[in-house]
A protein has these predicted regions:
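A conserved acidic beta->alpha catalytic loop
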Residues: 40-48
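N-proximal low-complexity "stem/linker" segments adjacent to membrane-targeting elements
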Residues: 1-23
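Glycine-rich, basic loop-to-helix element that forms the pyrophosphate-binding segment
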Residues: 64-81
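C-terminal catalytic/acceptor-binding lobe
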Residues: 159-246
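Short, acidic, metal-binding catalytic loop of nucleotide-sugar glycosyltransferases
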Residues: 24-33
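Short aromatic/hydrophobic "clamp" motif used to bind/position activated sugar donors
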Residues: 87
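Conserved catalytic core of nucleotide-sugar-dependent glycosyltransferases
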Residues: 97-167
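Conserved donor nucleotide-binding strand/loop of the catalytic core
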Residues: 52-69
């Protein structure tokens, strides 16, 4: 019997990508019990209305305001509400592309392997390892929350959301299955590094921030990532490839 799984994502707008995530989870979930938990932080673009109509989606509203209400805290709330022990955390602009996305990750969690997913490499002051399992695709066990798995930031700006989990798992002597991030040429729209795919999961990157922090993303990327030159062409390519009508 395949391990049941709770798929968790945090949303704040981005109807197109959220709907695509839900539909692709259904397509590639296989013969296992599952649920999809969506923690919404204030969507106003039709995302909530569509999610409320989905029988396999558990919708949890958590308004975004002030400290202790960031992405990591919202994701942790989803884990606490999850029905199943195995957790697959996805960013709202990610989705599975292959049938083996869970057999590569969730199904390999055991007494030694406590974390599996997509590896992001960067030098952050608070992380001595130079890499971590990125929360756009991270799998772990619910019972490890607060012990090995912490999704909120614990070290200020010296680490990123979700990075604490990798640090703690390694500190305690457990193993991690870390899959490389690769450029997803199938959905290339002109940017040399994004979108990506890892362990069968696609990630668009930047989408939520393009809705909420457009000017910041434009400045950080030197204009290489905008709604016009990245997000909109990517949506059109996804529509064409997957034959979507939304």
């Amino acid at each position: 019997m395949l391990r049941p799984v709770s798929v968790i994502t945090v949303t704040n707008g981005g109807y197109f990508f959220v709907r695509l995530l839900v539909e692709k989870v259904r397509e590639f979930i296989g013969q296992r019990e599952y649920e999809i938990l969506v923690i919404d932080r204030g969507s106003r673009d039709g995302t909530l209305e569509w999610l409320k109509q989905q029988p396999d989606v558990v919708l949890i509203k958590k308004r975004q305001w002030g400290r202790r209400h960031d992405h990591g805290e919202a994701a942790e709330l989803g884990v606490k509400k999850a029905r199943y022990e195995a957790i697959a955390l996805l960013d709202s602009d990610a989705h599975p592309m292959q049938a083996d996305w869970l057999s590569l990750t969730v199904d390999k969690l055991d007494e030694r392997v406590r974390l599996a997913g997509a590896t992001f490499r960067d030098k952050h002051e608070g992380n001595p390892h130079g890499w971590y399992v990125h929360p756009h695709f991270m799998t772990f066990l619910k019972s490890d929350l607060e012990k090995l798995i912490i999704l909120r930031k614990m070290r200020g700006h010296t680490t990123d959301t979700g990075e604490e989990a990798t640090i703690r798992v390694l500190e305690k002597g457990y193993e991690i299955l870390n899959y490389p991030l690769e450029f997803c040429a199938q959905f290339a729209v002109g940017h040399p590094r994004v979108p990506t795919v890892s362990a069968g999961v696609f990630h668009a990157w930047y989408v939520t921030r393009l809705f909420k922090e457009t000017a910041t993303v434009d400045r950080e990327t030197g204009g290489a990532v905008t709604r016009e030159n990245y997000m909109h062409p990517l949506q059109e390519l996804l529509r064409k490839t997957y034959k979507l009508n939304y």
